């Protein structure tokens, strides 16, 4: 994903390769899947993004272990080719952008209204500090409700402590798709332990229309 940006306040521009991702997915067995994804140029840096194995023990149940994006928010889970704009929203890029190493369990409830719940435990220190030992619990959970065709409601909660300050985040988002329209809104609230920093409020809303 190459782009050119011009900063009006500076009167300067730049070319940039924002992403050049390569992904490999497959199944070792019908009930065992894997994924490995690397970004060959994340603003000029090579980054290993995903490296995990996923089990499907029974219908509707998934168990995942490895390096992955944690279950949190709507927009942060979109790959670059799924983004609606050249740049990601602040929720996806700065406030809710978390990849980590850990273990998750997901389950799709056998109900009339499709409900998928996923939660997991993680190191809480990101992708590069995997050798550190942790005493604190770092978790993230997400629930998705598909009330009707095209209507999605997502609720998320996350609690991590990468260093001395614990961060607690809550997110609610929804989108509706009808015809060529995609209407979406998302709100994220983040607070820090012991009032270490001011609370964070982030909002992402947009309407997209696909041209014929």
Go through each PLM region and give its residues.
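Outer membrane beta-barrel
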Residues: 1-124, 135-139, 144-152, 206-209
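Outer-membrane beta-barrel and related beta-rich outer-membrane complex signature
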Residues: 48, 75-79, 129-131, 167, ...
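Detector for outer-membrane/organellar transmembrane beta-barrel domains
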Residues: 134, 144-212
